[in-house]
Amino acid sequence: MNRSEKAAIIEQLKSRAEAASIAVVTDFKGMPVEELTRLRVKLRENGCEYHVVKNTLARIAFTGTAHEPIGTRFKENCAVALGFDDPVAVAKALTDFAKTSKLFAIRHGSLEGKALSADQVSDLAKLPSKPELLARALGTMNAVPTNFVSLFANIIRSLLYVLKDLESKKAAA
């Protein structure tokens, strides 16, 4: 690889890293190509990219980005997963894949500029996804007016029962 090719790779990786909300460094030593392809497909479904790149180029590319804390940790055979939409979905996809593959491991990551250990990435995977959190928040916000309306409906219903009872008593008398 000549200098211009390396510079192009660095620039491309740097621009993708700047746009990513999460970056996770993984170990893939000895994994067959079929498994790596399955991983890439799974990650793509979750709005993520998976790059296998030379450690030196990755270190240079991550310098000056929000994910700089992991830039110094590129050692041996590793690749980086960059997530753009939902960091939790990316962490879940990687954690699930790590459970099924003995040759794949999560090393560390970075979430919006903060370094994460492998355990923290696994903990992140246990959180509900962004759509689930939004649904819970909307459900909670919707519960207050619903309960309010139900309360007033019960009061009005009770008043109507009392009036109906009075009407039937007057009609009987």
From Swiss-Prot:
GO process terms (BP): translation
Gene3D superfamilies: 3.30.70.1730, 6.10.250.290
NCBIfam families linked to this entry: PRK00099.1-1 (NF000955)
Cited InterPro entries: Ribosomal_uL10, Ribosomal_uL10-like_sf, Ribosomal_uL10_bac, Ribosomal_uL10_bac_type
PANTHER family: 39S RIBOSOMAL PROTEIN L10, MITOCHONDRIAL
Family statement: Belongs to the universal ribosomal protein uL10 family.
Gene transcribed to yield this protein: rplJ
GO MF entries: large ribosomal subunit rRNA binding
Pfam families in the cross-refs: Ribosomal_L10 (PF00466)
Highest taxon, organism lineage: Bacteria
Oligomeric form and interacting partners: Part of the ribosomal stalk of the 50S ribosomal subunit. The N-terminus interacts with L11 and the large rRNA to form the base of the stalk. The C-terminus forms an elongated spine to which L12 dimers bind in a sequential fashion forming a multimeric L10(L12)X complex.
Protein name as catalogued: Large ribosomal subunit protein uL10
Keywords, ordered alphabetically: Ribonucleoprotein, Ribosomal protein, RNA-binding, rRNA-binding
Any one cellular-component term (Gene Ontology): ribosome
Task of the protein: Forms part of the ribosomal stalk, playing a central role in the interaction of the ribosome with GTP-bound translation factors.
Organism: Nitratidesulfovibrio vulgaris (strain ATCC 29579 / DSM 644 / CCUG 34227 / NCIMB 8303 / VKM B-1760 / Hildenborough)
Chain segments annotated as transmembrane: none
